[in-house]
Amino acid sequence: MLKGRYIFSENGKEIYRSENVVTLYGKRFLTNFIAGNIIDYRKDLAFGIDSTAAVDNDTRLGFEFYRIPVEFGTTDIYSDDNGIKYFVVYKTVLPVDLAGVIKEVGTYPSRRTSSNSFDSKFISDFSDSFAWRDSESFNPERSSTGALIGEDVLSFTSGVGTEKEYFCTITESDFSGYSVNDSIRLSYYKNDNNLEKIKIRFYSSDIAYYEVEINDNSGTGNKISDDILLSVLYAGANSENPDISKINKIGIVVVPKTGLQSTVGMDGLRINDEDSFDPTYGLISRSVLSTPLTKVIGRLVDVEYRMELSF
């Protein structure tokens, strides 16, 4: 039987622990590792903001925002009244300049055996207000309200009864290697009940873009969109024939309800590779914290993953 837990400590004192689920991939990975079929022993710990319950068929964190290599791996063997216990232990340290609300944590191998230029990644973490502008070249304001990734969100505000778009110019990027089964997700903070929907646009020129919509008519507070398949994005091409291999700008449109104005705090936008197969790479373990752990700048936090092996 495999059991594991993640332990968070500060200044040598434990501040939190959370039990994990070893995934189906994790069980295969460990079996292959013992058999000598996996040579690279290095691991990463990943941290995210999604609180969806962990299950053994998880293939990734719900919404990852930070990943760091394991600094130290060892074993721990001791006996108690219940017999001898065997542990594999991985340790790392969250740096002082990291800020975020940790709701989930997972373990991955550090490397793939196959090359993949279209991996899961951030499109934007909305950390730079000067990178975004509206049609009049005004930058959005920063706000600490609702921030899960970093210390702030960017406040995107609509007009009164009219939609408003914010743009971010990026280095021309080729998204053509992502399949229709891959997905994007948006993390945001809904400040009011005046929001009708959010549009996300991927531009290959000033007039040619792909578009998806997030309809939101329920409550306020922190939100993570459902997985939006890229098949939906590709189907949302406008009539100007956009080119998915030459994306150079991202647009986000805030659409308010009739006669109202809405402000949305933008927190993170990710693209997730859902269907690339690598027999030596995947999510080994995932844990969802029952109470989120807030990591603030200026504070070192030690993280330890202890996997118990029963023979």
Predicted region positions:
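Beta-rich carbohydrate-recognition modules and glycan-binding surfaces
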Residues: S115-F277
